[in-house]
Amino acid sequence: MVNSLVEKYSNEIAPAMNKKFNYDSVMEIPKIDKIVLNMGVGDAVSNAKNLDEAVEELTLISGQKPLITKAKKSIANFRLREGMSIGAKVTLRGDRMYDFLYKLINVSLPRVRDFRGISSRSFDGRGNYTLGIKEQLIFPEIDYDKVNRVRGLDVVIVTTANTDEEARELLTEFGMPFAK
């Protein structure tokens, strides 16, 4: 089964982008390269069980086992030593990436309270978009009753676009609900 977003990209989005930006080669047309989900768990310093719960939630959200991130430097004020586990991240590519993007746009973002669209100022200047999610409860896989702590996560959408304008157009074509 081919993902509906993959079909939409090849049949509608790529030709529309080529027409709008007038690329010399079809290989120049921007596409989504990967999506990185990152969950920083600062309270894992005092209680390692919190990190295990975050890893479990990230596994449910992404459908893939996360990589546990470690502290690069020791910071005495935070009681943090180099090499301590302080977060988890997942890199999604291919079908899983498109499945997650579809779920994010059509299911999860509409579940955010008082949702009026996502900020269009979160592009990094190189065609990548970063979205901060305040609570993991917006994802349908997370059972509200089993969550003992509300955690946020970062979603970074990495594209092959050279400019923010191209990346914004690409994500808008995919259906990202940018605030007006």
Swiss-Prot record:
Highest taxon of the lineage: Bacteria
GO cellular component terms, A-Z: ribonucleoprotein complex; ribosome
An MF annotation (GO) of this entry: structural constituent of ribosome
Pfam families linked: Ribosomal_L5 (PF00281), Ribosomal_L5_C (PF00673)
Segments forming a coiled coil: none
Keywords, in A-Z order: Ribonucleoprotein, Ribosomal protein, RNA-binding, rRNA-binding, tRNA-binding
SUPFAM superfamilies reported in the protein's UniProt record: RL5-like
InterPro entries: Ribosomal_uL5, Ribosomal_uL5_bac-type, Ribosomal_uL5_C, Ribosomal_uL5_CS, Ribosomal_uL5_dom_sf, Ribosomal_uL5_N
GO biological process: translation
NCBIfam families in the record: PRK00010.1 (NF000585)
Role noted for this protein: This is one of the proteins that bind and probably mediate the attachment of the 5S RNA into the large ribosomal subunit, where it forms part of the central protuberance. In the 70S ribosome it contacts protein S13 of the 30S subunit (bridge B1b), connecting the 2 subunits; this bridge is implicated in subunit movement. Contacts the P site tRNA; the 5S rRNA and some of its associated proteins might help stabilize positioning of ribosome-bound tRNAs.
Subunit text: Part of the 50S ribosomal subunit; part of the 5S rRNA/L5/L18/L25 subcomplex. Contacts the 5S rRNA and the P site tRNA. Forms a bridge to the 30S subunit in the 70S ribosome.
Family classification: Belongs to the universal ribosomal protein uL5 family.
Protein name: Large ribosomal subunit protein uL5
